[in-house]
Amino acid sequence: MNYSDFIYDFNLYLCERFGYRNCCSVMHNANGICVSVHVGEMDLYIRFWEYSCGVGSIPDWSIIIVRSNFKRNQQENLKDLARFFKEYAPRYGYKYLCTEDDDYKYYQTLGLKLIHRGFFRQYNYGLPLKELDI
């Protein structure tokens, strides 16, 4: 998959919403890409997986929020980020929104359901994007 258009849309969203231009750091891997944003009020780390091979019960074509910290309005900004993904991600083939080892309780803010209960309280949550009610 060519990720440049999706990253362009994501960068545009971050610029329009928060005023930061071209702030995504993108790392390609065998499963898809990982995006980091560490600027101003934001600390984001998000995986965009095409293939999960069932790891952590995360489905293929998932957006996995690993870290999403905003200094102000945490819940509002997280919901807005999820709304962006719900609208734009299906255009690029993504079908699910998930969290990984969710100590920050993002799943409560987004209404995600438990999909994997691992050892040592490692819980993953997820939901199809079309079922996301935010």
What are the residue ranges of the model-derived segments?
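Non-catalytic substrate-recognition and accessory regions of acyl/acetyltransferase enzymes
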Residues: M1-N73, R83-I134
